[in-house]
């Protein structure tokens, strides 16, 4: 009996050891070293990565075998965080850019810097400038892309945000589409064709000289150029026109002309942001602290186009560059001790140097971050709702986007656009694959650049402009710090980033390749919808990570964002009330206490 019990015990232990190897990676005499890969993706991406894993396993048959474990649902992040604390973490896994820094600080992620530097396949220099360094982090100073920063993950792809629009609805509203960017305007105005093969004569433009406008009128006829960003005013006018058609002609009382859930391209186009790094010699801090500037009300400034270069606060700026916060603000208003920042939020002033350069015409004045943020909030508020009162003037809503409460989350906005209830939608590249599957034959649709800040003279010439801005989505592929198969895990990541792996992802539609050259090839520009795919490439050049990436986690955002996306954007709370709210003002303290201490 004892012998039988011993045999049974040995068999159980063997089975358990096999399970552990499968869960954490290990050797398999027949298949080679096992690498466990957790993939958090939708059905389209899942099919692509199943094929990537299959091809990788065929290529490295007998050496490495990747075991893919699909993990779907919104709870993935929580599940991964718990798993990484234990001993059975996957070898390779997805980490969103919002959670990456905290995982690195907690020691969950393997330092893959040496793998990258020694790789003949993974060349950061060939990739979009922002996306790879997004994952280069110094866990001591909590800063990105410093000389001491290390890579704890690499992007599997990049998904820029663009303006999706329903071309069927545009045409129904009497809008003519043209497609010619700034570089092609001279040739187009001289009689050449736009990217759709149309001349000015074909489009009824006659002798009119087309300017750098996204939405304009010629002889009573409306035009939309899907290759040039609209201004804020053009966006509102275009949305109102199509919305009127949807409601009055199509009898869709719940149709809307536009929707965006992100303020980034509104604030960033004029040089604003929600936090600013302030230098400090306080020994308890890391050499800096963060000030909360979501509604900072000093004007922003940009170097005029006819000014080659100038010095501001000892720093050289060239034409079209926005002056950074620390160079425009009189920093003597700040102290090394950040205590009481909330009480000082209205006290900061622009330097005399900046004001003088603006008076000389070398700098152009742009709206403040608060102005830009207010513009964003006005989109959803009804036309009889007071969003704010500025210098005695009541600012009402535009009523061109649905309230967040009525549209729901990601699924709600996606379904609304697919069903023709939204004429324009700001969204990421990943949704392209869904639109291809669900909208084929129902509606024509395409993409355009995100709106940006611009002012025009009476003839439609730009007099003042901001910069193109927006955020791109990205997910990192990371290796567990507890893995026993790091070299093999890196081989798989290399394959995902190779031309073959990136091509497979690009063809499915949910991302654009990491490499610039590959993105500019037929691999990405393959003729599938949307026709104006080059807009994604344009966006990838300048878009950066969202505010959720700035610090190690989202806790500093959640308190004020819940009020913003609740009462404020749903028309129940004015901007001034939001500015004075407890939820807004507690953020100053949270930033210092939880994110800047040594």
Predicted features by range, described:
Residues 1-35, 592-598:
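Short, low-complexity disordered leader/linker segments with a strong preference
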Residues 234-243, 279-408:
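Glycine-centered hinge/linker elements that transmit conformational signals in sensory
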Residues 42-63, 164, 168, 269:
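Short, polar/charged alpha-helical segment
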Residues 312, 319, 326-332, 339, ...:
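Conserved C-terminal helix/tail region of periplasmic/extracytoplasmic solute-binding proteins
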Residues 28-30, 48, 412-415, 419, ...:
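Mature extracytoplasmic/periplasmic domains
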Residues 97-160, 189-202, 297-309, 446-450, ...:
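Hinge/lid segment of periplasmic solute-binding proteins
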Residues 55-138, 168, 172-173, 178, ...:
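Extracytoplasmic "Venus flytrap"/periplasmic binding protein-like
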Residues 31-42, 64-69, 92:
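Short, well-ordered beta-strand elements
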């Amino acid at each position: 009996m004892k012998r039988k019990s011993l045999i049974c015990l040995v068999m159980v232990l063997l089975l358990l050891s096999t399970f552990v190897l499968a869960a954490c990676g290990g050797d398999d005499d027949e298949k080679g070293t096992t690498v466990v890969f957790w993939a958090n993706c939708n059905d389209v991406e899942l099919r692509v990565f199943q094929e990537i894993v299959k091809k990788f396993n065929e290529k490295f048959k007998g050496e490495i075998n990747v075991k893919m474990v699909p993990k779907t649902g919104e709870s993935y992040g929580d599940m991964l965080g718990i798993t990484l604390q234990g001993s059975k973490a996957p070898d390779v896994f997805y980490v969103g850019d919002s959670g990456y820094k905290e995982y690195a600080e907690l020691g969950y992620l393997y330092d893959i810097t040496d793998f990258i530097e020694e790789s003949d396949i993974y060349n950061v220099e060939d990739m979009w400038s922002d996306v790879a360094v997004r994952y280069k982090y110094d866990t001591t100073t909590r800063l990105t892309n410093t000389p001491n920063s290390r890579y704890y993950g690499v992007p599997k792809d990049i998904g820029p945000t663009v303006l999706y629009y329903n071309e069927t609805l545009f045409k129904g509203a009497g809008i003519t589409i043209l497609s010619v960017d700034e570089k092609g305007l001279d040739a187009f105005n001289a009689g050449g064709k736009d990217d759709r093969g149309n001349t000015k004569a074909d489009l009824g433009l006659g002798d009119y000289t087309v300017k750098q406008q996204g939405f304009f009128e010629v002889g009573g006829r409306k035009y939309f150029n899907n290759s040039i960003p609209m201004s804020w005013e053009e966006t509102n006018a275009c949305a109102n026109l199509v919305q009127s058609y949807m409601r009055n002609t199509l009898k869709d009382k719940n149709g809307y002309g536009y929707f965006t859930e992100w303020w980034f391209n509104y604030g960033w186009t004029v040089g604003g942001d929600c936090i600013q790094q302030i230098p400090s010699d306080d020994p308890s801090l890391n050499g800096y602290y963060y000030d909360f500037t979501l509604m900072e009300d000093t004007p922003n400034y940009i170097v005029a186009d006819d000014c080659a270069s100038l010095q501001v606060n000892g720093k050289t700026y060239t034409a079209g560059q926005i002056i950074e916060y620390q160079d425009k603000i009189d920093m003597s208003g700040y102290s090394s001790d950040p205590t009481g920042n909330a009480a000082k939020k209205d006290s900061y002033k622009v330097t005399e140097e900046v004001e003088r350069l603006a008076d000389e015409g070398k700098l152009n004045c742009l709206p403040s971050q608060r102005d830009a943020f207010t513009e964003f909030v006005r989109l959803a508020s009804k036309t009889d709702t007071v969003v704010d009162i500025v210098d005695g003037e009541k600012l009402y809503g535009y009523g061109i986007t649905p309230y967040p409460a009525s549209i729901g989350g990601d699924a709600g906005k996606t379904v609304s656009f697919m069903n023709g209830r939204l004429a324009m939608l700001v969204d990421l590249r990943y949704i392209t694959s869904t639109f291809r599957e669900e909208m084929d034959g129902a509606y024509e649709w395409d993409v355009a650049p995100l709106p940006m800040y611009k002012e025009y003279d009476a003839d439609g010439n730009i007099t003042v402009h901001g910069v193109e801005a927006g955020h791109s989505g990205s997910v990192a592929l990371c290796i567990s710090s507890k893995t026993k198969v790091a070299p093999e895990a890196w081989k798989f990541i290399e394959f995902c980033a190779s031309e073959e792996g990136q091509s497979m992802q690009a063809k499915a539609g949910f991302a654009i390749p990491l490499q610039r050259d590959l993105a500019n090839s037929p691999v990405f520009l393959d003729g599938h919808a949307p026709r104006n795919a080059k807009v994604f490439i344009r966006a990838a050049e300048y878009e950066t990570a969202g505010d959720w990436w700035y610090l190690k986690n989202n806790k500093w955002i959640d308190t004020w964002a819940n009020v913003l996306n609740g009462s404020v954007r749903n028309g129940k709370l004015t901007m001034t009330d939001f500015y004075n709210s407890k939820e807004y003002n507690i953020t100053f303290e949270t930033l210092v206490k939880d994110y800047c201490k040594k």
